[in-house]
Amino acid sequence: MGQKVHPFGFRLGYNKNWQSRWFSKKEYPAFVYEDSKIRAFVKKLLYHAGLSKIEIERAGGKVRLILSTARPGIVIGRKGVEIEKLRNDLRQKFGREFSLEVNEIRRPEVDAQLVAENIAQQLERRVAFRRAMKRTVSMARKFGGEGIKVTCSGRLAGAEIARTEWYRDGRVPLQTLRADIDYGFAEARTTYGIIGVKVWIYKGEILDKEVDQ
């Protein structure tokens, strides 16, 4: 059976950048594990802030977090109260100095991670999975996505046997390296069990000058 490679790992160094940017020889395993814990911790604290991506940079003993969010006001808070609280929580939890940068996502309708989380939240509210998929697909196409594919896997509509349903609109060329493919994954925790949601959004081609030559 054909398997699908992760769209980010497939394009790293070509048209996608690493989400953890640092170098270490002796502490490499510890840093990888700590990065995972930092992301889980921040995601849990900012669950309702529309957080799409957490990039981590390290220099010396300091850690720099770049948060991409659809709702920067919730992350920063009035007069920066919330972001300062987050910085203090991170310092207490991990014992390091953190600097935080917040980037706003202008079009959350074509951000694959936010789209996947939106579908998962609808499934948790008992919205029919086909309706949730079609609604988000039409919104993504309306806001400039050239193609989108959504899959939902699990006990859909409370069925006895788990299955996978998918819906696609437009082109989603997963094997084309120059294609700008955004990928997101989320889990919906329903009374019947966990339903996995995957989203691929095609935003057009990235034409590299060296590749063209």
Curated annotation (Swiss-Prot):
What would you give as a GO molecular function for this chain, any one?
A: mRNA binding
- The encoding gene is rpsC
This protein's UniProt keywords? Ribonucleoprotein, Ribosomal protein, RNA-binding, rRNA-binding
The record's section on PANTHER family has: 30S/40S RIBOSOMAL PROTEIN S3 (PTHR11760), SMALL RIBOSOMAL SUBUNIT PROTEIN US3C (PTHR11760:SF19)
- State the protein's name: Small ribosomal subunit protein uS3
| Subunit details | Part of the 30S ribosomal subunit. Forms a tight complex with proteins S10 and S14.
What NCBIfam families does this protein map onto? rpsC_bact
GO biological process, alphabetically ordered: translation
For this UniProt entry, what's an example GO CC term? Answer: cytosolic small ribosomal subunit
| Functional note | Binds the lower part of the 30S subunit head. Binds mRNA in the 70S ribosome, positioning it for translation.
Q: Where is the KH type-2 domain?
A: 38-106
Assigned protein family: Belongs to the universal ribosomal protein uS3 family.
UniProt xrefs under Pfam families? KH_2 (PF07650), Ribosomal_S3_C (PF00189)
Disulfide pairs here are: none
- PROSITE patterns for the chain: KH_TYPE_2 (PS50823), RIBOSOMAL_S3 (PS00548)
Organism the protein comes from: Desulfovibrio desulfuricans (strain ATCC 27774 / DSM 6949 / MB)
